[in-house]
Amino acid sequence: MRARRLIILLMMLLLLPQAQAERLTLYTRPGQVDEATPFQLRPTELSICSVTRAMGGVVVLANDDNYDSLSLYFWQDGMTEMRKLGGGFYWVMSSDTMETAQESCEYSMSRVPNYRMPDLTHAISNLTSDGETLYALNRINGLIFKISETKDGLQTEDVCTMENLSCLNISYRDLETDKVYTYPASLTRMHVCGSVLAISVMQENGIKVVLVDLTDGAIREIAGESLEAMYEWADGELLLWRLEGSTNEISRSSGTYTLSRYSVATGEETLLSTGVPYKKRSECGAYDPYSGSYYDVRTRQIVRTTDFVQEEPVVTFPAANVNIAVTKDSIVGVNLSSVYVRSKENGDMTVLRIQSSNGASNTALQHFAEENPEVILAQETLTKSAMNAASLAARMSASADAPDILRLGLTPDMPEADGSWPLDVLMDKGWCMDLSVYPEVLDYVSRLNGIYRDAVTRDGKIYALPIYAWSYGYFISRNVMEKLGLQESDIPTNLIDLCAFITKWNDNLTGAYAAYTPLEETESYRERVFDLMVRDWIGYCQAENIPLRFDHPVFREMMAALDAMRTDKIEQANQQVNEEISDYRECLIWTDAQAVGNFANYADAFGSRIFLPMALTPDVTTHYGIGYMTVLVVNPRTTNADLVGKMLAQVIADQEATAKCVLLADYDEPIEDSYYLTMVSDYEKTLMELRRQQENAPAWKKQGIQERINEEEASLQRYTVRERWTIAPKTIELYQQTILPMSYLRRPGILADSDAFNALVSQVHQGEISLEEFVEEADKLIEGLEQ
């Protein structure tokens, strides 16, 4: 029996390194380090720069922040921690020259104990390998050199010097002055292809690929405005991605790409695929020579592909968008602060699919991935065209790749045919799983403010999980109000009075208030106020649950006020060039600033902005429309209900305070700014030093020091009252007692996506139709849409 136990124990020990290698964290940057701790006693603080396959494993390049120099670390399958190969290299920034590098080193020498001046000839900008040997580039002098490990430490061997360095720059032409400006470009990737070093160089549009002959430093380029990315491939070849169509940011994210194989030796380019979507390409992947496949990064998920069309989910990393390198058995992923290892083959893993219209909670996903390493998180971004109930239902009913969870950003510009949100239709059609089966969700939803709870519940069932809400509104600039000598009671609180206020400003105050504007600067105040009236009238009808028609006494009263409003002097002043006034003029009233969801700049006693409830007329109820909400919806056909429950619980646990403050009725926890205590401590240290100097100063100096003390104390007082809170106690009070009671969840409405209605508004702007004609034509349009 004893012998059998020993055999079992031995087998477990033999298997342990392999089991550990499936899920290793080789390094995580420590948290806040006490500045008083000597450098030699501090934990290693690394800023991870890159990872590359080399020397039978991988080499991690990292900056040791304690000693301000680059070090190289090695890991291979079977190891449980990285081994330091050596260090002392200088890390070249893109804008560095030999002079700035020398100055930086001299500064480090004065600050860092035991700092040794590095060899700036062999400084490192980027590091790569041919799979075994490390190659480094120093962009300051164009030197390319090898780095190898010997019994005496790391040794460098010069390979060649680039014949010119201008190819590593980016140039752009200023359209106003026609001048051409040149500055150092970012070098995104490097690969060794036989006797050539390929460098991906960022350009104004896409990239160019610089090919450096390692025998003599000669340079040639693969150019083209459509070239967007370069990957390593087999047998000295590169994979090139080219954008199909025009080059602009919109087409880059929504357009399609061609994929071709480029032979560095012959210059021949072979087309492999066309019409490849943006989501199929990233800048973080790695070629796997052991299997002839490519591992690519999809947020946290790693996929394996050979044709960049079909993908196989492999594993999930805790962090998003890691850069990876592969060994025979493992994938090593790095970001700025961590180094992770995951096995290529993790057996039967569950795939939890999340499709999102507006990003995801990084904290919740990271914690979920750490706690559930057997789960692959497959994340996909929903395009705007997919944000309708029919498309979402089709996705959830798909036989393959159907999402388990939808993260939907509900906004004013994503209406259904009846003007509702897609969520409303999904709930009506039975495409939302009842989440009341999850205790954490049930408890959370029971604590929601009523308007959010009512939006996701029907007959005691919970069909979505609200995780954030935000909206915009009217604000008074406290600073401008005080500079103008006004009181809050002087500011209009309805659109009728706003027209009269603008007229008074126009007739009497344009000269005196030349450095300020009543509203955000606009070429036409009449257009701006008309748009506000239309927007707020549509919202009022929705809040009051009355049919939307513009032929209504309240709307006509607003149109009469608009017709009487005078803005000629204001708009004339806007067009005048006055060298004494800056191009940007401060405004008194913001009409579209974020009110709900961002509480940092207002609502405390000394905030820079004052929330301004704005009614339509003096005689109607004031409403505030909250038009943006993010919810999680669960596919009723999911086969991963238990994992979904874990994910929802994680999202609730990691919810940020600003979201809780908006959503939860029982939220009462003020949040201090994370930087506040540090700043107060700095002020107090300064005051302590000034008082010490004052005690020891001669009499004639004491008064001057006292004046400085008074200035610092006043500055500390201002900082304390204005900058202390991220969420101030008065913010919570204002939101719960003033904003919420007048709030409603504003749906897009049937006019939200109407080109015909937008054309009518434009005709009013251009003076092509009268306000009376607008009322008549808009109501005809609404009647037609309602049929």
State where each predicted segment sits.
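Extracytoplasmic/periplasmic substrate-recognition and gating elements
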Residues: A603-W700
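Conserved N-terminal structural module of periplasmic/extracytoplasmic solute-binding proteins
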Residues: E22-G31, L41-R53, L61-D65, G78, ...
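Glycine-centered hinge/linker elements that transmit conformational signals in sensory
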Residues: I502, W537-Q576, A603-T617
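Surface-exposed loop and turn segments in beta-propeller and other repeat-based domains
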Residues: T37-Q40, L85-P118, D158-T182, G275-Y278
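Extracytoplasmic/periplasmic solute-binding protein
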Residues: K461-I467, Y472, I496-L548, Y584-W590
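Hinge/lid segment of periplasmic solute-binding proteins
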Residues: P412-S471, I610-A615
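C-terminal capping/gating helix-and-loop segments adjacent to ligand/active sites or protein-protein/ligand interfaces
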Residues: L687-E786
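Beta-propeller fold detector
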Residues: T25-Q32, T37, E81-W91, Q155-I170, ...
